[in-house]
């Protein structure tokens, strides 16, 4: 049987998608070869790539004046690519700091520009939270404002989209496609694929057309969004299989009823899990309710010494990858789009049984 996979990334993929990929692996649509072996310049592959983009545009309702790029190097490469692409005419940017991933982004940006760090991570009644925008020291003349919507490691998520004057840039790696989003509020959106989009090796960048001419002169051509946009994200050979598989995920999402429909399921999963944790004396979640992530649910046990036993027994019950990030410890259940409601229900049953036996 397939286990329930709560990994933060590379994450669970829909079983139907994996089955279709398996079925097409050796002989893609009767062509006598795998799509992995196909030239990225061939008419067949270009059609696959174009359909993936069209389906993503449909899912996210992406306006015409935005380019969608299918790039390589993970979201971490974009920590450099973004300032190199956007600080060519104005060297100043604001970075909102709420956790480990936004910190990685701002540290990299400091190598290329004059970065104003907005400290927005706070504690409310002992729980981690994000401060009100009225308390932020935003610049009047920033080229852009950067934030990470969902801190995958901490399980901390913005309750809404910040309202700023400068173009808004956001790392949506662990929350893209999990809830409806007004793309027109952003100058640039980026996301590593390996959580809600597809397998590792692909990064999506959605950029408004007017920002394509802001690059620094010294930017490597492979990182230049304008060059990638002109060349259909194929300045060099793209991650063809990851692009294809992501296209299958987009098809699957459309079949589920799109982002609105999957969002309802995601809310149900999150409410069930947080509801159980809050009702328990044995488990604790460290995040203030308004800023709880609907994708990444961290929790601790009443006795830290039981963690290894919890993970071992969880694995024996086909509940995988529940260890928290090495930097923070504890547990974390990542409940992305492909994790079914039944998986969360099975996790809660196990957690309840474990607490009764060890509490």
Swiss-Prot record:
One of its GO terms (biological process) is pyridoxine biosynthetic process. L-glutamate binds at residue 41. Its EC number is 2.6.1.52. This is Phosphoserine aminotransferase. Catalyzes the reversible conversion of 3-phosphohydroxypyruvate to phosphoserine and of 3-hydroxy-2-oxo-4-phosphonooxybutanoate to phosphohydroxythreonine. It holds the Pfam family Aminotran_5. Belongs to the class-V pyridoxal-phosphate-dependent aminotransferase family. SerC subfamily. It comes from the Bacteria. It catalyses: O-phospho-L-serine + 2-oxoglutarate = 3-phosphooxypyruvate + L-glutamate; 4-(phosphooxy)-L-threonine + 2-oxoglutarate = (R)-3-hydroxy-2-oxo-4-phosphooxybutanoate + L-glutamate. Homodimer. It comes from Acinetobacter baumannii (strain ATCC 17978 / DSM 105126 / CIP 53.77 / LMG 1025 / NCDC KC755 / 5377). One of its GO terms (cellular component) is cytoplasm. Binds 1 pyridoxal phosphate per subunit. It is an enzyme of class 2 (transferase). GO terms for molecular function: O-phospho-L-serine:2-oxoglutarate aminotransferase activity; pyridoxal phosphate binding.
């Amino acid at each position: 049987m397939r286990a329930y996979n709560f990994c933060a990334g590379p994450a669970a993929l829909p079983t139907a998608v994996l089955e279709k990929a398996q079925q097409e692996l050796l002989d893609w649509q009767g062509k006598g070869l795998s799509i992995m072996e196909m030239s990225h310049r061939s008419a067949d592959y270009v059609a696959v790539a174009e359909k993936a983009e069209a389906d993503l545009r449909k899912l996210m309702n992406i306006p015409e004046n935005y380019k969608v790029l299918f790039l390589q190097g993970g979201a971490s490469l974009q920590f450099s690519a973004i300032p190199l692409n956007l600080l060519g005419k104005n060297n100043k940017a604001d970075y909102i700091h709420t956790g480990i991933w936004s910190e990685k982004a701002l540290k990299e940006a400091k190598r290329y520009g004059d970065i104003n760090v907005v400290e927005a991570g706070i504690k409310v009644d002992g729980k981690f939270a994000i401060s009100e925008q009225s308390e932020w020291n935003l610049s009047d003349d920033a080229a852009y404002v950067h934030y990470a919507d969902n801190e995958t490691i901490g399980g901390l998520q913005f309750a809404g989209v910040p309202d700023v004057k400068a173009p808004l840039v956001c790392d949506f790696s662990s929350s893209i496609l999990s809830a409806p989003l007004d793309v027109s509020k952003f100058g640039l959106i980026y996301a590593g694929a390996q959580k809600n989009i597809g397998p590792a090796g692909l990064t999506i960048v959605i950029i408004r057309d007017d920002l394509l001419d802001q690059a620094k002169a010294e930017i490597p051509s492979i990182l230049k969004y304008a060059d990638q946009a002109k060349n259909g994200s194929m300045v060099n050979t793209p991650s063809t299989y990851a692009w294809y598989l992501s296209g299958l995920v987009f098809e699957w999402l459309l079949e589920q009823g799109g982002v609105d429909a999957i969002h309802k399921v995601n809310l149900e999963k999150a409410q069930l899990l947080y509801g159980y944790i809050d009702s328990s004396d044995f488990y604790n979640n460290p995040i203030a309710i308004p800023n709880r992530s609907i994708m990444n649910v961290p929790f601790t046990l009443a006795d830290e010494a039981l963690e290894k036993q919890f993970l071992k027994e969880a694995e024996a019950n086909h509940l995988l990858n529940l260890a928290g990030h090495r930097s923070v410890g504890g547990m974390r259940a990542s409940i992305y789009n492909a994790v079914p409601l039944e998986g969360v229900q099975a996790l809660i049953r196990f957690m309840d049984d474990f607490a009764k036996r060890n509490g």
